């Protein structure tokens, strides 16, 4: 009986794992923040995804970075469409929690999505008085 239970448990886990991996891969947008001053990930930073609209920006989703400075799935559950987007990193609050000043209270990074079947990764290398970003993989 125990052997049958173990076999069923392993089989169930094996079939579930591809579904979990596939769900994470289907999300087309991820971000990652590294603090260049400490060399460590920037955890608990609020990041907002917005789409360019006729009269400004339309908020699509908001999330916080995990302990590794990542949001692995920032795109909302709705279907992706081509267009102009931006992620806004709320960095002022991050530094304020550490009793540090920052020149940039927010860092908006605009980008264009032209292929909804590709993955887009936006890394942010951050310090109190500067930042760098690029299209990651």
UniProtKB/Swiss-Prot annotation:
Pfam families: Transthyretin. Substrate binds at residues 32, 70, 134. CDD domains: TLP_HIUase (cd05822). It is found in: Periplasm. SUPFAM superfamilies: Transthyretin (synonym: prealbumin) (SSF49472). One of its GO terms (biological process) is purine nucleobase metabolic process. The keyword Signal applies. Residues 1-23 form the signal peptide. GO terms for cellular component: periplasmic space; protein-containing complex. One of its GO terms (molecular function) is identical protein binding. Induction: Induced by H(2)O(2), via the HprR/HprS two-component system, and by Cu(2+), via the CusS/CusR two-component system. HprR and CusR bind to essentially the same sequence within the hiuH promoter region. Keywords: Hydrolase, Periplasm, Purine metabolism, Signal. It catalyses: 5-hydroxyisourate + H2O = 5-hydroxy-2-oxo-4-ureido-2,5-dihydro-1H-imidazole-5-carboxylate + H(+). It comes from the Bacteria. Its EC number is 3.5.2.17. Homotetramer. NCBIfam families: hdxy_isourate, PRK15036.1. Catalyzes the hydrolysis of 5-hydroxyisourate (HIU) to 2-oxo-4-hydroxy-4-carboxy-5-ureidoimidazoline (OHCU). PANTHER family: 5-HYDROXYISOURATE HYDROLASE, URICASE AND TRANSTHYRETIN-RELATED. Belongs to the transthyretin family. 5-hydroxyisourate hydrolase subfamily. This is 5-hydroxyisourate hydrolase. It comes from Escherichia coli (strain K12).
């Amino acid at each position: 009986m125990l052997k049958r239970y173990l076999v069923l448990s392993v089989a169930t886990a094996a079939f579930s794992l591809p579904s979990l991996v596939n769900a994470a891969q289907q999300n087309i947008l991820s971000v990652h923040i590294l603090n260049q001053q400490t060399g460590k990930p920037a955890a608990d930073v609020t990041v907002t995804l917005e789409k360019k609209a006729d009269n400004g920006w339309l908020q699509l989703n908001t999330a916080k970075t995990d302990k590794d400075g990542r949001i692995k799935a920032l795109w909302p559950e709705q279907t992706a469409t081509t267009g102009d987007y931006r992620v806004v990193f709320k960095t002022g609050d991050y530094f304020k929690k550490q009793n540090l000043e920052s020149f940039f209270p927010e860092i908006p990074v605009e980008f264009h999505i032209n292929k909804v079947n590709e993955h887009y990764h936006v890394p942010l290398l951050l310090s109190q008085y500067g930042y760098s970003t690029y299209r990651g993989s």
